[in-house]
């Protein structure tokens, strides 16, 4: 998971 998700 990306940090913005």
Swiss-Prot record:
GO terms for biological process: defense response. The keyword Nuclease does not apply. One of its GO terms (cellular component) is extracellular region. It is found in: Secreted. It comes from Pithecopus azureus. This is Tryptophyllin-T2-1. The modification Phenylalanine amide is found at residue 5. Belongs to the frog skin active peptide (FSAP) family. Tryptophillin subfamily. Expressed by the skin glands.
